[in-house]
Every structure is written in structure tokens, then in C-alpha cells.
């Protein structure tokens, strides 16, 4: 059986089931909470949620969209709708498949049906795969975004279709995308202004996850392409990177192992990601305490592990995030968001509660 025939058969079997699910009683306390959110707020606060129940402690006074990257939770959907916030699907697909228009149509129809069945408000397309500029995938990706937007907007009133892009449009991680075409084709781009050391072309040393000037250079590149600032939402990291130092100089320069990535000799793969809640528990007992790098406008600290090895941890905190939030406001970007909201400590501990409130508060742009 050909791939297109198999897809059509799967769709024929799946759609009636999803339609029946959608028609079932609303899981919310009020039927109105199962209706899609139709209004659009002036300032977007876009939240990625990866599961569990920490969402109950989020700052819902700010949130406009929750992208569900964990298991679907109808309770989350009901609560978000009660606060006027959208809840959107994750959209991921192998790029080699989307060259086929029949496959694209089937994939989109399934996603629309799933969103309807789960009373959701759209989709966040997260495809972080390599694309060659001269490949058929280059045009197919833009077509997928355009057709997905058309399908969702037609079938779900007020729905939102967004696309995740790297911190810069300049071929990061070998992703040659039609950025202007994709921006035109969807509601807005979520710019992942983090993992900016995924390809290290200079010295193999530890550095900030999202250095201030480098981050802003990426937005300048997008804006110079003619993409409207109203089509850009700044993504900031609520996690950092922990690197083992092969050598730590007196100036706190941490030499790291050479781990190549997509052509670059070194990368942040030499380290590992650490959520902010873990960082806050470790920083005060570290060798150095929290330090501030003026060039990168980011905090870091050094610590020794039980075997005596020195580590350097780079992260973002309310100070570094506030600087970026001010840029969002000054240049009229669509909004701000983070990967991911689960990274904070939502326990009843008084200090943790204060730290968590400060991180949410840093999202509010100040000049």
C-alpha cells in the first residue's frame, strides 16, 4: 500500500472517532469553557508546559498562550480558558514526509480534528530539523505552515498557528528556512533565544545560554529581513547549562570538551541543561557564588563536584531577563515567552516562592 493511501485510510478511521470525542460532554465545569478563545491580546506571554500539575501555580495574570508539550490535561485546558488563555497543540513532523501534498493535508486534518476533540485553540509548529536551501523541503515547510494556518483558521474560529525559529535566521544548526514566507504564513514566530552556543566556532569555552548582544543581533537580522516586530515573540530560557571545566583560568574562563555539532567544532552539548529551580539551590553553596559577566550580561557561578572537578554554570535570572524584556517593549515585539514554565520551584518554601515570583515578574517589560 502506498504511503498516501495508508494516510488516507488512517484519516478515514481516525476522524469519526475524533469528531465523536469532540461532541461528547465538555470536561469543564461550564460548557462555555470548552469554546475556543477568540480575542487576541495586545501583548503575548507564550508559555511552554511539559506536564504534571505545576501549571496551577503559574502567573495566570500574564499568560496568553500555553503550548502543551507534555501529556494533554483537560483540567489545564478548562483553567486556561477560564483565564482567557489559549491552549495549543505541539506540531512536529518529519520533513521528508511533508514534500508530499497528500501527506500534508492528512497531517493537518488530523491535527485540526485533535484540537477540536480536546477543545484546543491552535498549534505551535516545532520543527528544528536541518534543511538545505536548495532542497524540496525548503518550499514544503513554508507550504505546511501556510496550509496549517488556513486549515486551523477555517475550522476553529480565533485559532492561532505559530512556528518556532532559532535565535537567528542565519543558518543556525543548518536550518535554512524561508523565514519571511513562514512569518507571513502564520500568526507569529516564537524566537528561541536560547541554546545560542549550539555551534561554537571560536574558542571552546563555556558561555551564556543567551548572551544579551548576541540575542539582540538575532532580532536585528529578523527585522532587517522585513519581518514585522509584531510577528516576533521573544523566547527566553528558564534553564541554564552546567559545563565541566577542563581548565578554569584566574579570569573565570572555563575551557570545555570539544563536542562537534552540525559542522561546528564545539557546542553546548559539552554541558547539560539545568532548570532554574536546581540552580537556585546550588548557587549559594558554590565556590564562587553568583557572578555577573558584563560582556554577556548574564550570571554564572563555579562549583566543585564530589570528585573535585570544577564546573561552570551559566543561566538567566530576573536581571538578565529584564534587560531582554525591555528590548521587547522598546522595539514593539509581539511579546515574550519561555522554555519552559516547569523549570521554576512552585513549592511552598518561602524563598523559592519569592524567586519564582521574581522570574515571572521579569517578563513584564520595563524601559
UniProtKB/Swiss-Prot annotation:
Subcellular location: Lysosome
Role of this protein: Involved in the degradation of asparagine-linked glycoproteins. Hydrolyze of N-acetyl-beta-D-glucosamine (1-4)N-acetylglucosamine chitobiose core from the reducing end of the bond, it requires prior cleavage by glycosylasparaginase.
Glycosylation-annotated residues: 178, 213, 247, 284
Leader sequence segment: 1-23
Family designation: Belongs to the glycosyl hydrolase 18 family.
A GO term, aspect molecular function: hydrolase activity, acting on glycosyl bonds
A cellular component annotation (GO) from this entry: lysosome
Name recorded for this polypeptide: Di-N-acetylchitobiase
Keywords, comma-separated and alphabetical: Glycoprotein, Glycosidase, Hydrolase, Lysosome, Signal
GO BP, one annotated term: oligosaccharide catabolic process
Gene3D superfamilies recorded: 3.10.50.10, Glycosidases
EC number from the UniProt entry: 3.2.1.-
PROSITE patterns with a match to the protein in the record: GH18_1, GH18_2
Domain GH18: residue ranges: 24-367
Record: active site: 128 (proton donor)
Amino acid at each position: 500500500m502506498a504511503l498516501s493511501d495508508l494516510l488516507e485510510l488512517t484519516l478515514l478511521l481516525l476522524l469519526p472517532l475524533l469528531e465523536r470525542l469532540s461532541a461528547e460532554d465538555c470536561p469543564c465545569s461550564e460548557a462555555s469553557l470548552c469554546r475556543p478563545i477568540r480575542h487576541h491580546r495586545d501583548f503575548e506571554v507564550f508559555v511552554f508546559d511539559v506536564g504534571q500539575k505545576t501549571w496551577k501555580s503559574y502567573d495566570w495574570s500574564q499568560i496568553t498562550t500555553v503550548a502543551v508539550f507534555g501529556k494533554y490535561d483537560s483540567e489545564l485546558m478548562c483553567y486556561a480558558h477560564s483565564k482567557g488563555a489559549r491552549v495549543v497543540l505541539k506540531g512536529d513532523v518529519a520533513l521528508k514526509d511533508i514534500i508530499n501534498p497528500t501527506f500534508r493535508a492528512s497531517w493537518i486534518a488530523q491535527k485540526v480534528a485533535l484540537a477540536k476533540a480536546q477543545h484546543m485553540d491552535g498549534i505551535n509548529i516545532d520543527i528544528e530539523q536541518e534543511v538545505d536551501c536548495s532542497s524540496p523541503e525548503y518550499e514544503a515547510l513554508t507550504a505546511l505552515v501556510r496550509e496549517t494556518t488556513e486549515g486551523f483558521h477555517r475550522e476553529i474560529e480565533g485559532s492561532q498557528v505559530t512556528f518556532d525559529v532559532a535565535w537567528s535566521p542565519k543558518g543556525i544548526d543548518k536550518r535554512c528556512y524561508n523565514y519571511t514566507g513562514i512569518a507571513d504564513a502564520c500568526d507569529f514566530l516564537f524566537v528561541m533565544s536560547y541554546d545560542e552556543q549550539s555551534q561554537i566556532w571560536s574558542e571552546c569555552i563555556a558561555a551564556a545560554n543567551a548572551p544579551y548582544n548576541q540575542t539582540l543581533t538575532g532580532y536585528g537580522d529578523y527585522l532587517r529581513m522585513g519581518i514585522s516586530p509584531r510577528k516576533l515573540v521573544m523566547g527566553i530560557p528558564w534553564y541554564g547549562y552546567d559545563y565541566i571545566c577542563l581548565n578554569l583560568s584566574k579570569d573565570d574562563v572555563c575551557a570545555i570538551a570539544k563536542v562537534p555539532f552540525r559542522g561546528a567544532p564545539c557546542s553546548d552539548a559539552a554541558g547539560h541543561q539545568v532548570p532554574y529551580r536546581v540552580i537556585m539551590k546550588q548557587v549559594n553553596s558554590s565556590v564562587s557564588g553568583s557572578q555577573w559577566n558584563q560582556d554577556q550580561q548574564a550570571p554564572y557561578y563555579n562549583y566543585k563536584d564530589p570528585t573535585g572537578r570544577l564546573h561552570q554554570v551559566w543561566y538567566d535570572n530576573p536581571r538578565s531577563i529584564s534587560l531582554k524584556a525591555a528590548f521587547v517593549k522598546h522595539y514593539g515585539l509581539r511579546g515574550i515567552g519561555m522554555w519552559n514554565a516547569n523549570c521554576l520551584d512552585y513549592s511552598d518554601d518561602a524563598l523559592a516562592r519569592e524567586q519564582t515570583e521574581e522570574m515571572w515578574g521579569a517578563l513584564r517589560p520595563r524601559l
